[in-house]
Swiss-Prot record:
Its cofactor is a divalent metal cation. GO terms for biological process: nucleotide metabolic process. Its main location: cytoplasm. InterPro entries: ITPase-like_fam, Maf-like. The keyword Metal-binding does not apply. Belongs to the Maf family. Coiled coil: none annotated. This is Nucleoside triphosphate pyrophosphatase. NCBIfam families: maf. Keywords: Cytoplasm, Hydrolase, Nucleotide metabolism. Signal peptide: none annotated. Its EC number is 3.6.1.9. PANTHER family: BIFUNCTIONAL DTTP/UTP PYROPHOSPHATASE/METHYLTRANSFERASE PROTEIN-RELATED, BIFUNCTIONAL DTTP_UTP PYROPHOSPHATASE_METHYLTRANSFERASE PROTEIN-RELATED.
């Protein structure tokens, strides 16, 4: 019998990525205080890559404790802007200020995934994407935030590339799935190796 896969996430886009790839899974959303963990790691000068990995692992571990024998997938995405971690904006004003700072600049998205099985990590990967934002006018950015706030409030950096946010960028260097928050190709390779999916 195949080991079941559990997605430890409430993210609709991550669930959709697995569904689109025909990966059988169930969801169990962990209740974790991400902001406290992030703050503690930042206080220790942890780099953004390590923070993404630690948050993904924390989610997988929490759900793995409830489901022995299952493979539990935890994911997290962070935005590294000039060595500074940007999170989901807490207000339209924050989103606008951060977008103005990133206008005309490069930043990096780091998408971490960790699989736990029987209380132990068995696989992990952090994918990275480098993005360059166009030089955008303040009036365009103000309108963009006003039009898209209900959606972008749930996205690191205040944009979604699968929506109007794609217009903010001049170049994107990296895997599209990592932009969406999951290193899907690497995950599928591991699941095929373990016999969770047919190849």
């Amino acid at each position: 019998m195949t080991v079941p896969l559990i997605l430890a996430s409430g993210s609709a886009i991550r669930a959709q990525l697995l569904e689109n790839a025909a990966v059988p899974f169930t969801k169990d959303v962990p209740r974790v205080d991400e902001e406290s963990v992030k703050a503690a790691l930042l206080a220790e000068s942890a780099p953004p890559r390590d923070i993404a990995d630690a948050l993904a692992e924390m989610k997988a571990r929490k759900i793995s404790d409830k489901h022995p024998g299952a493979m539990v997938l935890g994911c997290d995405q962070v935005l590294d802007f000039q060595g500074r971690l940007l999170s989901k904006p807490d207000s339209p004003e924050t989103a606008l200020a951060e977008l103005k700072q990133m206008s005309g600049q490069r930043h990096m998205l780091l998408s971490a995934a960790v699989i736990y099985e029987n209380g132990q990590p068995v696989w992990r990967h952090v994918g990275q994407v480098r993005l360059r934002m166009r030089a955008l006018s303040d009036s365009y950015l103000s309108g963009y935030v006003a039009r898209n706030w209900d959606s972008i409030r749930h996205a690191v950096g205040g944009y979604k590339l699968e929506e109007e946010g794609v217009r903010l960028f001049s170049t994107i260097d990296g895997d599209h799935f990592n932009v969406l928050g999951m290193p899907l190709l690497e995950l599928l390779n591991f699941l095929a190796l373990r016999g969770v999916i047919d190849t």
